């Protein structure tokens, strides 16, 4: 695959962002390298869609060199974790080394309201703010996406709740 677009967290469940981005890019005819943490039914589904699936670890430099090599654009997203900042810096360093030309970072809405003198009590929000600062300093061409609400996961969970509610309401 020539110059695939890398999507980290492609099998993730946080708003199904990685999976949705992968699907949309593939529908546009783009070559996609979908990074996952492990092989499972979600990675098989990505492969069935046409993505090049690679197993990687955001905290492992060797792993990230293998995952990022040959990609000029990447969508970076990961689940909430104490290692979020370390993973972001690790990935940014490897992306810079490989000459990534566009780094799209999935951040959080609250980051836009923070500064060096005004932060929040939330450790996750602070990690996202610090990660954005590190990406800005990295020299990479970065775009920060700060969603307010993820409805994709809600839709999946809500549909099963609605089916149960309808079943109960109909006396079934």
Residue map of PLM features:
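Extended, polar beta-sheet/loop recognition surfaces of beta-rich domains
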Residues: 90
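Oxidoreductase cofactor-interface core, primarily capturing Rossmann-like NAD(P)-dependent enzymes
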Residues: 1-45, 59-62, 66-71, 80-83, ...
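Hydrophobic acceptor-binding patch used for acceptor engagement in glycosyltransferases
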Residues: 74
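Short, conserved active-site loop motifs that form the nucleotide-linked donor/cofactor pocket
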Residues: 50-52, 142
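Cofactor-binding loops of NAD(P)H-dependent oxidoreductases
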Residues: 56
């Amino acid at each position: 695959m020539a110059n695939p677009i890398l999507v980290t967290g492609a099998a993730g469940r946080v708003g199904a962002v990685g999976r949705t981005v992968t699907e949309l890019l593939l529908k546009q005819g783009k070559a996609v390298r979908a990074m996952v943490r492990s092989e499972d039914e979600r990675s098989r589904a990505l492969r069935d869609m046409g993505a090049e699936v690679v197993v990687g670890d955001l905290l492992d430099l060797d792993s990230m060199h293998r995952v990022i090599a040959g990609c000029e654009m990447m969508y970076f997203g990961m689940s909430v974790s104490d290692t979020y900042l370390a993973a972001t810096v690790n990935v940014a360093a490897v992306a810079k080394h490989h000459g990534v030309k566009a780094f799209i970072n999935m951040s959080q809405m609250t980051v836009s309201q923070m500064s060096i003198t005004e932060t929040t009590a939330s450790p996750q929000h602070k990690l996202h703010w610090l990660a954005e600062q590190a990406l800005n300093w990295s020299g990479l061409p970065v775009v920060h996406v700060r969603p307010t609400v993820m409805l994709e996961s809600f839709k999946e969970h809500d549909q099963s709740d609605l089916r149960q509610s309808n079943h109960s309401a109909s006396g079934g």
